[in-house]
């Protein structure tokens, strides 16, 4: 219990730390993407707000530098010994002649050619003036701060986009989540149309697929509602509860996918106690690990405001991918014996479906493995140079692709097992059930003992 509490506390601390909305003498650099009004639309004026919170009254000056990362090369200068510096110090003034004496302790930057760079010098011996930096062009903006006397200071930074309060890293999720909800609704409507036509011959697999379609449609609808609420209102208790609910539904959805895929690969097309026992015996632990890891991955991805998610996200993402690949590999290994059993018992319609199903499982293994490598590269890379180019699509390569894989998976299953006149051929009885029947195993053991006894005589 203590270990679990420590783990949960570490996760919470990582989330709070990764938010990085406080600017102070320890975290003197903040970077984030922000959209312009012309690109994202909306009624608000996009801007970066820096509101000072630390008590003042000390003799000091704090310089705040805000700029678009594209102009990073216009900051700093080389010394005479080829060392690069961003701050005007005594050597920069009297030895290298890079700045004037009245610029001591300030940032070095090219004020003649810079377009987005703004410098704000805040005296701390009085009530400091809050900073408003207006955004006219979408980009990856950074805030650098520096105290001349290295005294403590603190400010709260708000990255205000024109469309609302949703962070720029989460903005693409909102329309795409709504689009996926519509896609699930269309698939579900078509499925219900075929189901109504052949309602008297619906088999168990088709009922499971219909449940997954309804569950996925509801999950995406809840995600859209939570994101829209967070965009219209400030973050509060409802937002945290909504993000937790979205993460739980997301993890449940994918665990149900993996469980159904594994059950079908074993050849079970209807519920039985043998199927349940086999699932609990062979896949219970991987499914539980996958559920917890997927919950944390989605919760981190939609909760953390910063572009950089941290090492905890990488750890849980890797755990989720490994457990999912383990289950998929087990399904792929079990499929050849299922295909042979289908041929032996002359279930040719189901055999043709399972051949396509095997290709789908193999494609799932390759897709998850490939996207996992790309996501880990994105997650572990905290270089601002690369983030500046990829901050708009970074969300997709981290965890957004999982929704696309799930949508493709459900479309394929719905197409293969769609209700039709061949419904009875899609649910053979006795295909794999006797394999793990304990009574049959006892009879086989007794038969083997009798054979050994006869041979010994």
Curated annotation (Swiss-Prot):
GO terms under biological process: cell surface receptor signaling pathway; retrograde transport, endosome to Golgi
Subcellular location field: Endoplasmic reticulum membrane
Keyword Magnesium recorded: no
Signal peptide: 1-18
Transmembrane segments: 174-194, 208-228, 244-264, 285-305, 315-335, 359-379
Ranges in the topological domain labelled Lumenal: 19-173, 229-243, 306-314, 380-457
SS bond partners: none
GO CC terms of this entry: cytosol; endoplasmic reticulum; endoplasmic reticulum membrane; Golgi apparatus; membrane; plasma membrane
Gene Ontology molecular function, alphabetical: signaling receptor activity
InterPro entries: GOST_TM (IPR053937), GPR107/GPR108-like (IPR009637), PTM1-like_N (IPR053938)
Membrane side Cytoplasmic: residue ranges: 195-207, 265-284, 336-358
Chain coiled-coil ranges: none
Membrane topology: Multi-pass membrane protein
Top-level taxonomic group: Eukaryota
Pfam family, one: PTM1-like_N
UniProt keywords, alphabetically: Endoplasmic reticulum, Membrane, Receptor, Signal, Transmembrane, Transmembrane helix
Family assignment from sequence similarity: Belongs to the LU7TM family.
Protein name (Swiss-Prot/TrEMBL): Uncharacterized membrane protein C18A7.02c
